[in-house]
Amino acid sequence: MSGSLYRSPSAALYKSPSMSAFGGLPAAFGSMSVADLGSLTRLEDKIRLLQEDLESARELRNRIERERADLSVQLIALTDRLEDAEGTTDSQIESNRKREAELQKLRKLLEESQLENEDAMNILRKKHQDACLDYAEQIEQLQKKNSKIDRERQRLQHEVIELTATIDQLKKDKHLAEKAAERFEAQTVELSNKVEDLNRHVNDLAQQRQRLQAENNDLLKEIHDQKVQLDNLQHVKYQLAQQLEEARRRLEDAERERSQLQAQLHQVQLELDSVRTALDEESAARAEAEHKLALANTEITQWKSKFDAEVALHHEEVEDLRKKMLQKQAEYEEQIEIMLQKISQLEKAKSRLQSEVEVLIVDLEKAQNTIAILERAKEQLEKTVNELKVRIDELTVELEAAQREARAALAELQKLKNLYEKAVEQKEALARENKKLQDDLHEAKEALADANRKLHELDLENARLAGEIRELQTALKESEAARRDAENRAQRALAELQQLRIEMERRLQEKEEEMEALRKNMQFEIDRLTAALADAEARMKAEISRLKKKYQAEIAELEMTVDNLNRANIEAQKTIKKQSEQLKILQASLEDTQRQLQQTLDQYALAQRKVSALSAELEECKVALDNAIRARKQAEIDLEEANGRITDLVSVNNNLTAIKNKLETELSTAQADLDEATKELHAADERANRALADAARAVEQLHEEQEHSMKIDALRKSLEEQVKQLQVQFRKLKRRLLGGKRVIAKLETRIRDLETALDEETRRHKETQGALRKKDRRIKEVQMQVDEEHKMFVMAQDTADRLLEKLNIQKRQLGEAESLTMANLRVRRYQRELEDAEGRADQAESSLHLIRAKHRHQLLRAKMLQRQKFTFSKMSNRDN
């Protein structure tokens, strides 16, 4: 009975709190405060004190039981001795007295032990009541905490729901990250293709560079040749300029001489007019003189004799006239010689000018040839320059594109390096985390196996406890039956010993009342404890079912979380493998891109050097082109000057032809005059012959002048043809210039198209940069998500650790509960043994009462016998 007394508080202490704690397992130990731990320590201290009290009570009861057993043995022996010593003597009566004294001592000892037991029971009741109050308070606190734990559990359930939502979101983000990784792989493939295209483009640029270098060398050679030709042309130009200056000076001298000759010719014409008038006068005079000569001849014939003196006088006059005529003829001859000298000088100047004109024509032809060559070279140079410009523009565009791509590649490389470093760090962190996860997973699996094993053990323990509860119920029923039997026996013993107790009622009335009160209290306690036990059993069953359900739910949740963690771990391992493979691929592609970038950088440096060399060569070509353009302009200016000079020469030639015509007319008139003079002046035959010779020479000179004029006409015609050819070539040059302008316009349109394409490429580049920024942001978001996943994993790890700690605490509590159940079982066993001992004590008391009654009866009989003997002795003495 008293075992149930000691069972219910421990059950209330260790069953309900632990069960409530197990009910709120995911949250109770997660939110258990220091006060709860303090209360648990206080409860453990109280339990320890109660256990010590129980042990002391056990020791006392054991000692009492031993003493009772000894006393029962002694009583049995005494009863046997009393039965054997019933017909003994006074010595036996003395021994009976001694035995009664011993029995009194034993009764005192029994009473003292009963008092000690009652004191211990009162102390235990007080302690039990205090413990019950403490347990009630603690139960209330634990109920409050249980409500808090339920709220916390609900909150944790919400958090679990949120965590599942976040896990789903993380799965979605992971799927998106995988898609992004696939896009990154596609972009890496595109980048590798672009890098290959860049390599091919760089190879093409290298080939174009080699070709351009060869063309540049050829152009340098051509430019060198052109420079040499330009130097020669400049030298020829300088010589031509000098010759033209000399020709200009000569022309100016010739013009001055021509003006002088014109003035002299005018004077000669005036003189010829005067000579004509003089010749007319002389012819008239000659005619008159001939007439007079005829008259004179007639008169001479008539008057020869008469006028010999007059003839002499007239001969002197004729001589004077002849002298005068000879003087005039000499003057005329001198003037003609001067004219012939002037004509010879003019012929020399004409021949010199003709030779100069021929030289100029030859030089002009050479200049035209050189101009044609230079024009062809200029066209080639313009073509090459245009091609070089186009190539330079293309190269500059390609160079800018390559620079942009190189910068973009460098930026991509830097980003890839950063991403690679981050990925390496993430890989290392993920490897460490994976190792930790594997270890934690292994530990969690072991803990889960332990938890499953412990759960199985708990199920077995629950089954065992249920069996023990059933056994306790049966034991309780048996104890109740034994109590009823004991009560029945006690009633029968009371009925049998009612007569014997009449004498002991006064002494034992208080004890009986106390025992009755104690029995009532014990009955009340037993009823209360049975009710509490029933309630505790019901609560325990409900709690066990609830705990079982909760454990099953928690085990299912733990299994789900473990499965989720396993799946997450497997997915993380897969993602780690994928990321490691992607990292390897990215590392290989990064190395390839680094090599290609190094090659592109080397090629870029070579291209820069080539571009600098080409730019220098282009500058030289531009300088040469400018020089050629200036030379062309100078040649055009020289051509215009030559055309002007040719026109001047043509005008001079026309003037000379006019002068020649005038001279021919004048010579014809002079020849007519000379013919008339020869007709008129037979006397001046020598002068006439001389004049004829001079006229013949003049005619020859005239023929020569005619031939020279014919040559000049031919030269003029050839010069006109050359001028026409030059005009045709000039028109061709204009057309070519127009064609060049059209080509330049086409090139400008091409440049505009290229600029638009460049703008489009820059826009695309900006778009790609924006996409790369978006991808960087997405990578950062994925990194943040990975960090959050890592944090969630750390939190899950912490929760797993807390669960393991809770499982350990539960295990410890289960061990403590097992120890308490064992202690309760021991207490129950001790209580049963105590009850049995009490029953045996009651039986011993009843037997003792019987023995006392028998002993009293025997004493009375002995006294009566002694009295009878004494009376008999007195009577015998009296009789004696």
Curated annotation (Swiss-Prot):
Coiled coil recorded as keyword: yes
Keyword Cytoplasm: yes
Keyword annotations: Coiled coil, Cytoplasm, Motor protein, Muscle protein, Myosin, Thick filament
Location relative to the cell: Cytoplasm, Myofibril
Coiled-coil intervals: 35-859
Record-level GO cellular component terms: bicellular tight junction; myofibril; myosin complex; myosin filament
Region annotation Nonhelical region: where it falls in the sequence: 1-34, 860-880
InterPro entries: Myosin_tail, XRCC4-like_C
Source domain of life: Eukaryota
UniProt function note: Paramyosin is a major structural component of many thick filaments isolated from invertebrate muscles.
Quaternary state and interactors: Homodimer.
Entry's family note: Belongs to the paramyosin family.
Protein name per its UniProtKB record: Paramyosin
